[in-house]
Amino acid sequence: VKLKLPDDNATDASYPYKLVNPAAFSLFVPSKDRTPPNIAAPIPSVCVQIVQGDDDLLQSARDIKIRLCFSAWDPGYHGPDIFKPKGDGSGTYIQQYNEAAASYFVKNGEGWRDAWNFVDTALRLIENAEHLGDLRVIKEKGITFGPVTEQDAVPDFYPYWFAWAEFSIEETLTRNPKSYQHLL
């Protein structure tokens, strides 16, 4: 997935936006001044959070509910966002790279599609995975997802867009006190 890198000071055609792979964070998304040096910006990103864990002591299993928080930035259509049919009957589309495309910008509220394409890509990967590392995806619990809401309403953070997905994983619950006794 490649998404637009935000530039909070530019929302017109003069901004030659850059596409980047989203950053990944655990627990929280750091502020712009606290991002690691190799990360251009905290958005676009996915943040992995542990929501809840349950140990089944009789089955020696641990279920962990994971929440993925997705963020994207998109103030509107820039010229290179628009693809035109190639015109040779192949069904192929080509990206515009010309002077007219470079100066084209329409501010709109369609940037939510970037966040949802990001979510959809992650959902497909999770749905098709049996395991994530040595953790089993608990498919029988399903996946839930939605837009970020406040008091049951989707807040307007234009040009930033947010969504989430939750699923459960399982690991074998093993206790080996010798391996961590020295830490107690």
Question: What is the role of each PLM region?
Answer:
Residues 1-10, 16-20, 74-76, 100, ...:
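Localized chelating/binding microdomains
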Residues 60-81, 85-109, 122, 157-175:
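Oligomerization/assembly interface segments of phage tail-like spikes and tubes
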Residues 25, 33-34, 53-54, 73, ...:
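Short, internal active-site loops enriched in acidic
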Residues 1, 46-48, 66-68, 126, ...:
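Hydrophobic beta-strand residues in large extracellular and virion-surface proteins
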